Amino acid sequence: MSSPFLWRFLSFTQKYRGTLLAVSSVGLFAANISYHVAPEQTFRKLYQGWSKGEPVQLTAKLQGLFQEVLEETHMGVTSSYVPFSAFGFHPVSAGIPWLPSGCLIGIPFNYNDTEQDGVGIADRVLLINGKEVDWSSDAGTHLRQALNLSLDAQKFSLAREVFYAQGNSPIIQASAAPVCLSGICLSSVAIKQLLGLYSGPILLRGVYNMAVVVLGFAGYFLCSDAVSQWLDYQSDRKVAAVSKSYATGGIEFYEKILAQNRILRTLMGKQGETMYSPSGNLFPNDYLRLKNAPYTSRRDRIKNALLQME
């Protein structure tokens, strides 16, 4: 009984393959871009910082710092970028500036204190593997130093998120999946026709289709990761080109991230060894993918850019 259904299904997909490909591509793009289109309803709910059951409001100091970054980076319409207080220790962003919803930039609360203040985050409770970090211990002291950033490093990290959104990076990243899907489907059909597989045995076509699926996934992973890394490098390059202070801030920012990860690798034990490399880079979740550019590579590229500016 399944055979007639299978033949009807194959006939349907063969007849409407163009429409199915278009709908699938649009669906993939919509799924990947959804939280950038409505960041207030999706992204902010995930990253909003909370304290005592209430959302943490961004301080006047951080609002002033963010406006200063927008002015120094010469962003045209500053109202398109909306900052808010986010949890964590690094800035996050989502949204597209030219859309009505704009772009949200999440600024961590610890940015209220800088390396120059000498305060840092020692007054906050940080739990790692269910245990509170002792800020007076050697590991706690080094972690506190790694989490405290200078004003230049804070500016770099915020400008990086602004440039990432300003360059339409979310759209480019979301386009990788539908472009790969369309490319694989169209090329596989062309190769089938070229080799005459449509008139060949159905088993041979099945083996060919399975090979196309495997190669398609591998190609998507490589393409998506390459695009992601290129966007990371592009954002860093643009920010480093603003001024020498931004470039030096970028070097410090990535060095501090590497230092944080090395300390977390020690504090988290076996779990930390699976997440962070001895250098401080993130280990990929699987062996086939490297979604983000290594921090050491991003730092070294900024160093080279700084040398060219001198």
Swiss-Prot record:
It is found in: Mitochondrion inner membrane. The chain crosses the membrane at residues 18-38, 171-191, 202-222. GO terms for cellular component: membrane; mitochondrial inner membrane. The keyword Membrane applies. Residues 39-170, 223-310 are mitochondrial intermembrane. Residues 1-17, 192-201 are mitochondrial matrix. Its main location: mitochondrion. Keywords: Membrane, Mitochondrion, Mitochondrion inner membrane, Transmembrane, Transmembrane helix. It is a multi-pass membrane protein. InterPro entries: TMEM177 (IPR026620). Belongs to the TMEM177 family. Plays a role in the early steps of cytochrome c oxidase subunit II (MT-CO2/COX2) maturation and is required for the stabilization of COX20 and the newly synthesized MT-CO2/COX2 protein. This is Transmembrane protein 177. It comes from Xenopus laevis. The lineage of its organism: Eukaryota, Metazoa, Chordata, Craniata, Vertebrata. The gene is tmem177.
